[in-house]
A protein has these predicted regions:
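Histidine-acidic metal/acid-base catalytic patches
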Residues: 31, 59, 67, 81-215
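Active-site acidic/histidine proton-transfer and metal-coordination neighborhood
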Residues: 4-98, 107
Length: 215
């Protein structure tokens, strides 16, 4: 993850893109053909000035990925699946793909993770197994600026959303996993637990939860 404002600022992108290309090289040296990261908030309107800035950066990384055989997977979250799908379609690169995080879609974008699987199907190469719920909707631009700048005024993240152990949030795991199977996805369900008093116990529970769901 490039941190800061990801790939949303033209003046920062040459250095960040170059570093990302080297990260892809390193991943291949380590035997991995997928790199995942956040790219920033994709505007819903293609006419937004930031859209072209992000296109240029992602197209450069995608074209390099096509050349060397490494896929660059954008983690879902700040924008709805239909917006991300349109953005990816506009790039024309096989290697710009998706790391589907169902909890981010539900917690931040207020999107349906099951429908997102179908919308993003051609691009999904990796997934996170994470759960949570939205408490109050807030503009994802504000939330992701908090992560970039470390300040969110009088708003607290715990007032926006809550990450929860698997099965305790709003992700409909039966339907979600069935949707992944339906598009032929047989890759990783990478458990992600970033908060809570005992993340290790939550991860162990998540392993058993997924085993039961996949049985």
């Amino acid at each position: 993850d490039m941190g800061g404002h990801a790939f949303t600022r033209a003046e920062d992108n040459p250095k960040k893109v170059e570093r990302s290309l080297r990260i892809m090289d390193l991943a291949l040296d380590l035997g991995s053909s997928v790199v995942t990261t956040h790219i920033g908030v994709v505007p819903a309107d293609p006419a937004h000035p930031r859209y072209a800035v992000m296109q240029e950066a992602c197209r450069a990384m995608g074209e390099y990925g096509d050349k060397v055989g490494c896929r660059f997977a954008i983690e879902t979250g700040p924008e709805k699946a239909v917006t991300l799908r349109a953005f990816l379609d506009s790039l024309g690169c096989r290697s710009m793909c998706v790391n589907l995080d169902p909890a981010n879609l539900a917690m931040v974008a207020g999107d349906d993770p099951v429908a997102a699987v179908k919308t993003l199907a051609p691009y999904i190469v990796h997934t996170h197994a994470k759960d949570g719920r939205m408490i109050t909707y807030h503009d994802p631009e504000i939330i992701y600026d908090f992560f970039a700048d470390g300040g969110i005024g009088d708003l607290r993240l715990e007032d926006c959303f809550q990450e929860l152990p698997l099965g305790q949030g709003v992700v409909p795991w039966g339907e979600y996993l069935a949707a992944l199977r339906g598009i032929g996805y047989d890759g990783y369900l990478t458990i992600e637990r970033e908060v809570g008093p005992d993340p290790a116990a939550d991860i162990a529970m998540a392993v058993n939860f997924l085993k039961e769901k996949l049985a």
